[in-house]
Amino acid sequence: MKSRREKLLIPALTLDLSPSSQSPCLLSPGSPCSPCSPSLGLQPWSCRSGNRKSLVVGTPSPTLSRPLSPLSVPTAGNSPLDSPRNFSAAAAISFPFARRADGRRWSLASLPSSGYGTNTPSSTVSSSSSSRERLHQLPFQPTADELRFLSKHFRSSESVVDEDGGRSPRLRPRSRSLSPGRTSGTFDNEIVMMNHVYRERFPKATAQMEGRLQDFLAAFAPGDRLALADGVLGFIHHQIVELARDCLAKSGEALVTSRYFLEMQDKLERLLQDAHERSDSAEVGFIVQLVRKLLIIISRPARLLECLEFDPEEFYHLLEAAEGQAREDQGVKTDLPRYIIRQLGLAKDPLEEIQPLNDLDESQPPAPGSPESRGLGGPSRRKPCESDFETIKLISNGAYGAVYLVRHRDTRQRFAIKKINKQNLILRNQIQQVFVERDILTFAENPFVVGMFCSFETRRHLCMVMEYVEGGDCATLLKNMGPLPVDMARMYFAETVLALEYLHNYGIVHRDLKPDNLLITSLGHIKLTDFGLSKIGLMSMATNLYEGHIEKDAREFVDKQVCGTPEYIAPEVIFRQGYGKPVDWWAMGVILYEFLVGCVPFFGDTPEELFGQVVSDEIMWPEGDEALPLDAQDLITRLLRQSPMDRLGTGGTHEVKQHPFFLALDWAGLLRHKAEFVPQLEAEDDTSYFDTRSERYRHLGSEDDETNDEESSTEIPQFSSCSHRFSKVYSSSEFLAVQPTPTFAERSFSEDREDGWGQSLGDRGRRLSADLRLRSWTPASSCQPSSCQTDRGPSPSLLSTISLDVMPKFAFSSEDEGASSGPADPQKPVFILGEPDPPPPTTPVTPKPCNLSADTAVLSHARLRSNSTGARHSTPRPLDAGRGRRLGGSRDPGPEKPRASPGGSGGRVPKSASVSALSLIITADDGSGGPLMSPLSPRSLSSNPSSRDSSPSRDPSPVCGSLRPPIVIHSSGKKYGFSLRAIRVYMGDSDVYTVHHVVWSVEEGSPAQEAGLRAGDLITHINGESVLGLVHMDVVELLLKSGNKISLRTTALENTSIKVGPARKNVAKGRMARRSKRSRRRETQDRRKSLFKRISKPSSVLHTSRSFSSGLQHSLSSSESLPGSPTHSLSPSPTTPCRSPAPDAPTDTASPPNVSPSSSSPASPATGHTRPSSLHGLAAKLGPPRHKSGRRKSTSSIPPSPLACPPVPTPPPRSPSPLPGHIPIPARSPRLRRGQSADKLGLGTSERLDGDGGRRARGAEAELVVMRRLHLSERRDSFKKQEAVQEVSFDEEPGPPRGVPKIAVQGAEATPGTPGHARKD
């Protein structure tokens, strides 16, 4: 019977019958001698074996008619030289294996060492030698003995003893066999076997690839280099690095295969295609080079594994399918192999790739920044800026900033602009996270994810322009509507699942899923937003579906801090274990429960209690009429599994989509489904569906006022970007095409002129700033920053005053500092991110006492502006005059005393002394003040602004004493070579003290000693930030965040008014002087609310905001402080005038209510306004059970967790409630009464006065603690993204000091009795 190929007259194989060939040769595109290389066309080849005959196809199937390799066939006496002329399927099935010692396969290594498919004249001899070895496949499943033999066989260079005692091979002038047989064994076994052979045969290739991948990751990791300006390219950069990291991990685990490399190449090509299609930036060239470099790194191992894993059977299957498809579609009748080779891209003209290189000068895009690149693509289009948008109204406030509704001035299109405070980001080391959020929002193109159009920066804010979603968020909907109907909850949940599926496919873990971040569109559909805590991991790959991959993916990220919102945090995050995509599915389970029930399943009065319920408690289900459907209950139960391995969704989104709860849901038609709730907008600018949260966050004042302080003008490079969708919308806009892009200095000084600066000063500053920028971007600037100082012309202090281009001196991480400490690359632009630090002085510079230094006078105009309220500070006239002379070029070193206002009630108080020096002139009987009004005088008990203030350059005060230049310590490791100690400095004979830090010892030969640091000096500033009044833990934190470079300002103790004395006996009665700041403009009662909650005893309930972050160290919260450590302030906050409790100071009756700095005793003042405090430090493990204070609980609803306390003014003090003190609470039930809104649920809770606070009021004839419960809606805010504001002002009548009980808090504070106590007179 003739075969199908003979009927079609199409040869199955092309045989080489040319006269130059001694025998016919099989030509297959997959064989080593096939024309796999473009340099080989269809030309005569030399044969592989001089004795091998041609193959005659006699069976219908090509896969059964061809052996897997040139094996010896059990015919004609088992001769290895016989041709399988009579080969059949039956013979192939019953084919016996040869002896174990002969278990070799035909070798690809018979080719020359350089490659694959290279034809050489010696191939005939090599093939003859290969044929004489009677090569066979390896056994089906090798035993342990066989594996040992194979290991010896592949590793040894000696010949193996045959079973008959002979040596096999006797003559082997080439390398050994590469691979075992391709049998139908299990997939995992084949991968292990193949990688074993690969690593044994090619150890250098493996080591070379892993080494290059490590260098690749070290050089191009996103955190170690300047971020890309384009958000899409930034996200692609993240993914390329993640692919390289995953390849390195797979190689170390011996899990790489040719299929893995093939998919990796496909992913890289897709990312490169996205870069070309969705970005117009010149930075695409960087992505192209990055992809090309990674492909070169993996090319050699990929080719080797492809040769090792070549499967003829699979290839013939594909070949047969290609033949049939070609016959059906295109009617190919002749020369089928040539067609297949052409379709596979194996016969390309090699000149095709070289041809574009001839026109390189014409076709290649010019380098970024060149004049040619500016004119590329038509008229130049500048990036958007703040002036392009007009603000309509506030949408919502947040921890780091606010969201506003804006309108584009040219197109009149509405957007939502998110303004994030720069200083808050810098002080919390969150700059990189903002770039991640920008990249995700820019790259994401999904109907259920909010998209971003552009980003830019102003002097004080980073701005992201996003699409405006009109319908508010689901949290507000739950607050107003109560539990949602099942169908409505199903649709919202399903649309969120689709958004999550899209994000997870690109390796994005949201980490902060909650109803607040689910926005409702004008058509009633869901859009996911707020990626401020998100992580970018590895995108989904089919080859990662191996055994154990789920467990590895569930531990993809490991953080040293707990991030998220307490009620939605998964157990693995609480335990500080590795986490991954399953944390989002846990949050989805909590969200669905909240949708259907109306409250979260886990709650508590403290974070510890809440987390204890999360990791241990059972879920409470509603009963009776409010019972949930069984399928919904089952879905929630499976989503809230404690183990991430057992959680629904861990194996993929399809697990959730296939649940019976969505049985009747059309996943493909969700957007076409009519929503039950459609927002009804009264006007275009209607934002009534949003909660502004103005009672919790006060950003309004700071948004309106722009001051002249240089520290607020920090430029974060590469943040401004324009997405592809924005480019398409405004590509034809003349407004964006014509106007030039203002520089950062121009934007800054235009705002300065609006604030009242002179025109001449602005012009001069702009010229200086432009000159500084030009010098900074010169490629030839390869000197150290300190050595470049003299080449800049003006003095550093003048540049720091006028130029707004420089980066302020903050405590950056080590990787941020490391980039600027070493010499710059002369071939790359030099990015000067900070003012150059002067070299360590050889001789100490000691100005005359009572004189203002040049730095003090120059920086005097840089007024502190609060990031929370933005009240404007005034500038004393003498300092303004001095500033004007110095800006004009005069450097008169003569003494100059500022005119301070009299110490009356109407006089202004200087803001702080954190820049120039630390004024310690405290006199107990100085009640009227003097010409040198000190911040620590009895008129103003104010140590300094917040320890996390937005500006390290604060207002100077007149100082008597010497202030040394900054001491810059460079350390190659983590050791600076000095130790410090916290001391108490008492004010006069009172029990009020502040905490200072002195250098306790300096090691010999250490970097600190070389920099000029001396033991016994008082530390005033660390990296430009004042440490006056900071607790020891915060000072250590500032040091640890500095990396390998730290800048200290110190002064000798003998130059201050601090007198060292014996330790006090009654140290428990001491009270800390608390930090406070005064408001600049509005001093009404509502702007002077106290921001500290009250607690009755150390074990009482800790009220915190719902959003907090926990690091490795334990930070003190507002109610946990040592007797010797002041409670610290964590962020810039509105200032409050406060008075001194010194015995001689008169009582100010107009001051705010009395608030004790760390009130823990029943006798301390207790009334005041409450505001959310920050739980910045959470114990690394859950501590022992805390004793709850007696509080009456509501029986009508579930007690919400007080994790966010809005600063609503508390009612005036009144008598204790006559209601019974302790009402036993019944069994906890999560049911909420549907007819009762969240406002009603919280009604009356703010007026409960009994419990612990009530007992205090009745028993001690003291103040009254007002504890209030929180509404359910007030418990939703991010852990990490919150305004950590803590400040207090108190005014206390003269009287005996009250004791402060000790609270056990971990830390290294100076304890009572140590020789670190001092007294200030």
Curated annotation (Swiss-Prot):
Residues 59-75, 176-185, 931-958, 1105-1166 have a biased composition (Low complexity). It is found in: Cytoplasm. Residues 966-1054 form the PDZ domain. The keyword Phosphoprotein applies. Keywords: ATP-binding, Cytoplasm, Kinase, Magnesium, Nucleotide-binding, Phosphoprotein, Serine/threonine-protein kinase, Transferase. Residues 663-734 form the AGC-kinase C-terminal domain. The active site is at residue 512. Its EC number is 2.7.11.1. It is an enzyme of class 2 (transferase). This is Microtubule-associated serine/threonine-protein kinase 3.
